[in-house]
Every structure is written in structure tokens, then in C-alpha cells.
Amino acid sequence: MTEIQDPTYSRPIDVHRWSDHPEVKALVDDLWEGYLPETITGEAGGNARTGPKPKTPFKKQLRVLILDLYVAWLDDPELSIGVSMSPNAWKTNSRYNALHLSKSLIPIIKALDAAGLLDLAKGSYAGPGARGNRTTRIRASGELQTKFREAKFIRDDVTRFEGEEIIILRDAKEANKVGKEVEYVDIAETIAMREELKAYNDLLAASFIDIATLDKPVIEVHPELEASHVHINADTARSRRVFSRSNWEMNGRFYGGWWQRVNGDWRSKIFIDDQPTIEVDFKGLHVAMLYAKAGMELKGDPYDVPLTLFQAYPPELTRKLVKQLVLTAINAKEKSSAYRAFRESFPSAHRGKE
């Protein structure tokens, strides 16, 4: 096993990975029979011998985990998955957990780690709301990576569970934090929105959206800030709608498409079904809406400020910092919270903290 050098280079576990490909089942069967103890597997059916049976059998939960480790490995062998090892964190009956993964996944992770199939960095907790808090990080070890290489299935054989929720309701968020997902009862409007968005995602799935000039389906974004990578694949070519503050009238924006996370230069190179595209660009949309509300006309780029104010910064970085500050301020309750949220969004020693 290899030590995870950077636990922050990670993403949350995706609880909706799925595949019925026979070779996927064969790999999971091999891991199940060869590495998981009888205290987990039981004598038949993949359920433990004692205690209540999980809503989703252990072996199916193992399949979801292995598939997500496989996808993360394909994206980047260094990429880790964040997973909670606290039983209380698993909400089996949540609408945001359509496959009903449960705390039963915890002993599976421990068994795979003990068998040398995972690299694992334990989670940390420094107190409520502390910035150092994080969940356990896992990724495929060298031994599991070898099994992935030998497997007779490919990335396109890994899909998403059809019942995944795509209409998301979140509560009010604290500064610099994403609001928590809120359970809700469907109404006519949410049912209609879900059907409409499902049709849109079906259209995206039936289209080939790509940047033909890329050697690999990955784009590095914001290298001058905190570099991250945008992967171009089936998972990142789909959308969900997110509403805020436990209110169906708040936000409702579309998120998920990889094209939303790259700059205009990259977007100008997008092809759909081998045909070039033209983007209708609404510059400074949020600021323009505020101007319109005040009965004023916005002229020029609202994020373009005189270089004399930021002589030490490159123009491109200056614009990105100004834009981030403005958008943070729009969503803040007061100046002090806007400044604090802006500074906290950057890593230590970053220029954005100056």
C-alpha cells in the first residue's frame, strides 16, 4: 500500500455508480469470495449472519464502491475518494441515496484495507466547523489497480443508477460552505422539473460533446489559483438542479456540465456530434441583473478594473479575483462576511488572502 500524500486531492464518494456488465460482476465476485471475511459475507445471499439485513445487500454495496474506485483510478491514480466511517453519516432511506448504501459499507472498506486493496488516510476532526475536518480518504492500491487493468470492461460500461435524484434542495449555508441536502415531499412542480431535466440529460447522453483538440479528456483549470482538473466523460455531461435555503423559489440553477467549469477559450472549441458550436455569451450576468433591477445599463466588463489598482497581479488573475469577490459579495449578508468568505476560499499563502 502507498501513503496518500495529499488527502485534499479528493472528491466525495459517488453513491450512484452502477453497472450490470458481466465482467464487473465477475470482478466483484472475485473480491467478495477472496477478500471479505465470513462475518461480512454470511453463508448465503451476501448478508451478515447477525443483525438486521441491510436494505441493499452487502455485495451490491461492494459493487458501487469498486466501480467508484475504478472511475477515480481512470481519472487519476492519485485521486482519492472521501468516505465517512461514521455510521450516523449514512442515511439509507434518503432520496439522495437511491441505491440505499448504508453503514454496512464501513466493514467492507475496513476489510478491503486489511487485505491491501486500498490506500487509506484516516479522517480527522478538530471540532465543529473546523477547517481541518475531513472524512477518510481511500483509493485503489497497486494490487487493486492491477485487477482493474486486467478487468475486461471499460469506462463506458460504468453507468449511473437510473433512480438518482436530480432535483436537489439544500438548506441555508454557512459562510464558505455548501448547504446540506434536505429531504422533501414531491409536489407537482418538482415532478414536472424532474421529468424535464431527465429529458435534457437523455439528450446530452445521446450527444457526443467533446473538445477535439485535447490529447486526453481532461482540462486543467485555474492553474494560477488552486489548480484543479475538469474531466470530460459521461458523468460530467449531465445536469442537476439545485435550490437553496429550503425554498423552491431560491436559485434552481443547473449544475454538472463540464462546460460550466472551463473558460471561454475552451468553450469556443466544443464540438457537438462532430459539429462546431457558437456560444451566446452573457458577460457579467449577475452584475447586469443588478443593474437592470436598478434601472441602469451596464456598459463594458464589470470585472475589468484599472491595472493601477493591482499592479502586482497579471491581468487574467486580477479579473478572476475581482469576479470572485463580486460574486461572493452578492451572496453575502454584509461586507465583513463577504471579505471573510472570499479570503477563506483560497489556500494558505495565496494572493487572494492579501
Q: For each predicted feature, which ranges?
A:
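Non-catalytic DNA-binding core/recognition domains of DNA-processing enzymes
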Residues: 52-71, 83-115
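Short secondary-structure junctions and interdomain/linker hinges
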Residues: 115, 119, 204-221, 296-297, ...
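A short, conserved structural fragment
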Residues: 109-128
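Helical catalytic core of nucleic-acid polymerases
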Residues: 34, 47, 81-102, 258-354
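Intrinsically disordered regions, especially transient/low-confidence alpha-helical propensity segments
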Residues: 15, 29, 70, 87, ...
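Conserved catalytic core of nucleic-acid polymerases
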Residues: 2-59, 66-76, 102, 125, ...
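Acidic, glycine-rich two-metal-ion catalytic cores of nucleic acid-processing enzymes
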Residues: 135-318
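Minor-groove-contacting beta-hairpin "wing" of winged helix-turn-helix DNA-binding domains
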Residues: 125-139
